[in-house]
From Swiss-Prot:
It comes from the Bacteria. GO terms for biological process: iron-sulfur cluster assembly; RNA modification; tRNA processing. One of its GO terms (molecular function) is folic acid binding. This is tRNA-modifying protein YgfZ.
Amino acid sequence: MAFTPFPPRQPTASARLPLTLMTLDDWALATITGADSEKYMQGQVTADVSQMTENQHLLAAHCDAKGKMWSNLRLFRDGDGFAWIERRSVREPQLTELKKYAVFSKVTIAADDERVLLGVAGFQARAALANLFSELPSREKQVVKEGATTLLWFEHPAERFLIVTDEATANMLTDKLRGEAELNNSQQWLALNIEAGFPVIDAANSGQFIPQATNLQALGGISFKKGCYTGQEMVARAKFRGANKRALWLLAGSASRLPEAGEDLELKMGENWRRTGTVLAAVKLEDGQVVVQVVMNNDMEPDSIFRVRDDANTLHIEPLPYSLEE
């Protein structure tokens, strides 16, 4: 990507975030085009893409035959097909898997590094963008297209916007917002996704979890009414036979080091500590607080105490902005 990422600064929690423009270089874009693109994606992902309108974006999982996620995708309609956003670390292997059956269909599947991904969040984000676009997305219309630009709206953890655009528009937005907005890199958007409870699947955790272990059913990312797709049998079994015993949790507190994706944590059991869970992502905020997204058993006590392995500091459970009740 020729567009240069902004220099990093410590991320801030959504409640205190000033107006911020972010380069989302840790995320990546991919597309599918061609006459069979809808039918093809319908047979590959957990969401019902046939029901998707131009005004929607959806979270979906792309699974292996055992129902384990290669990746999760933020999907939207793009041209005569679809585009999706995923973590850059998993894009190449995910596209390799997606292309396996493409030879039999009229589709072209490709990485897209021509377009630039930007995020806008923080204080009065909507007002800042209102001067630059004739229409902004909202709850009723979550995707808006204008010229070379697609804008995606997110409600949680606080209103924010993801912008998919060309380099010229990205430069224009940066020039226009530079004076009033702080500039930051992907870590700030990652912190907001952790706060929102959107699962972050990086390479270390690809092929490890069924979608429900990362709360995808609570985020509208799984259709249990659609036809066949890869891994469907295992995903359905987890729902109808209660086979899933895991959930995605948000932890906050302090730690002397950030746990890495794929690492476990420790749970306090009386005087002892027991290893538990798998970290998906973690970020240290500017106030020193550490936030961790972790997959653990879904029956954790709300007052449980955790720590990064052998650390002197502790982490506790924070509420997510959605319910896991079926």
